[in-house]
Amino acid sequence: MPEQEPLSPNGRKRSEVHYISIPLNRGSAFSPDDSVSQFQSDGFMTRRQSILDHPVGSFKGVNSLSRFATSLRRANSFRNIELNADNERSFFKESNDETYDPDTLAPALDGRRLSVTLNNAGRPRITNLANNDRVSTASMAIHDDDYGSIQNSTIGDSGSILRPTASLTEMMSGGAGRRFTNNDMDSIVVKRVEGVDGKVVTLLAGQSTAPQTIFNSINVLIGIGLLALPLGLKYAGWVIGLTMLAIFALATFCTAELLSRCLDTDPTLISYADLGYAAFGTKGRALISALFTLDLLGSGVSLVILFGDSLNALFPQYSTTFFKIVSFFIVTPPVFIPLSVLSNISLLGILSTTGTVLVICCCGLYKSSSPGSLVNPMETSMWPIDLKHLCLSIGLLSACWGGHAVFPNLKTDMRHPDKFKDCLKTTYKITSVTDIGTAVIGFLMFGNLVKDEITKNVLLTEGYPKFVYGLISALMTIIPIAKTPLNARPIVSVLDVLMNVQHIDEAASAIKRRAAKGLQVFNRIFINVVFVLIAINFPEFDKIIAFLGAGLCFTICLILPCWFYLRLCKTTIKPWERVACHVTICISVVLSTLGVGAAIIS
């Protein structure tokens, strides 16, 4: 089914987007071998149904739990650092050949070439996707819950499972005689689009539904930065602190929408790095790769600090340095686990974070005397302590709004990208309530006694049920275990590429294979050693969060999106939008400088 794309930057209508549906069993996996032509090897191999594939309440069909898990896995794979600054598009080996991960059907830097899969025997070739006269008359229209009516094309290949005479049951199951009874069977959908440069490329269509995108967005935004929000509110005071939180939430929501508009200028753009290249060329992509590296490094360090501080508060006889060293032996093994498993483990991270917030709130209601009580709040301040602390609060209060690095990927992964703005609205409503609520509750409970991590206050305050102390420590221990490996993976991939060991040639000698595997192991261990060493030398959690917020969040979430919009949408931007973007950039540069300076000086 053709679908009209938005207007291009020069105002003309772009070519239509053609969608082609290829039947498959959704509970399938890709073969690693691109060369074979048997159905189970050249496309999709059936596997046993997981318990997650079965409908559970509202979680059924395209929103089944297995689809949520797969969508989360794709979202986690979007966090990557690109070394090839000259590459116009992130996930293309050639000008019109996208690469993807066979397990998640997500774009991947080192994935399988889409053309190889489509060009295997019995598959619609890329050149056929827009040439209906070459497609068999057996093509039919099917209906998908999210895509709507889509052209389902087959090629007249008598030896193919997708031959025109094959029944729908055969196409779905790989053989005759089996009834089409699985409600979770559908199709892989590819689309053929024309970029602003006139090149026609074939891409995988987005797969995530709106609820899945909202879930992935919340998972990106709600992190350990919210644990430092009460301290930020203490530094800024009620008046300025709450005002800054509201402004940061609104501003980052608006810039996320600007990124969405920038993506609409060219349907072949997929990632944040693609926007950087489109706006500033190779230098833009290189800058973004450097920023992403710093962001991942800072996140990994802050997780190690959180681990050490939380256990030290529970077991003060052991130093924070001791627990940081212990964290190395705990977070290093998961780095060797496949992404499919890590993605499921990462769910524990957001569950632990939200669980911690709920526990803290319950503790405040349980305790009747201050400090640590919502019934009898501590004394608080309306205005900042001093100018230095006000500047430090800038980074603390802005760090929790940084999800823009993966927002472009989340939009392009949607079945209906036009719903992305509505998803953002829901995401920011939930995130704003969580973040602002945590800041207010923490500040009321501990007032001017609040520490860099609100959990540390709870662990050091007497009067709560005994199990609370162990529970919070356990939750704070789970978060680094769940998230540190995901922060390390992109940096490890960079080291593997630099050392040319990202792929081990099985045809090489045994010595070379062992050396390559040894380097891969070394890289994974080395990154975690770096996390721990930096955490030991820079042990203050609030300073790390303030630096990430003021230095990186302002750049990635406010300055660059406005700059992208000014460059990529210059022919359609309204005058007031141009002024607003320039004002936002100027104010962000000033606030970022003040915040970074305060974090370094303090």
UniProtKB/Swiss-Prot annotation:
Keywords: Amino-acid transport, Membrane, Phosphoprotein, Transmembrane, Transmembrane helix, Transport, Vacuole. The keyword Transmembrane applies. It catalyses: L-histidine(out) + Na(+)(out) + H(+)(in) = L-histidine(in) + Na(+)(in) + H(+)(out). Disruption phenotype: Decreases glutamine, tyrosine, proline, histidine, and arginine import into the vacuole. InterPro entries: AA_transpt_TM. It is a multi-pass membrane protein. One of its GO terms (cellular component) is fungal-type vacuole. Belongs to the amino acid/polyamine transporter 2 family. This is Vacuolar amino acid transporter 1. The gene is AVT1.
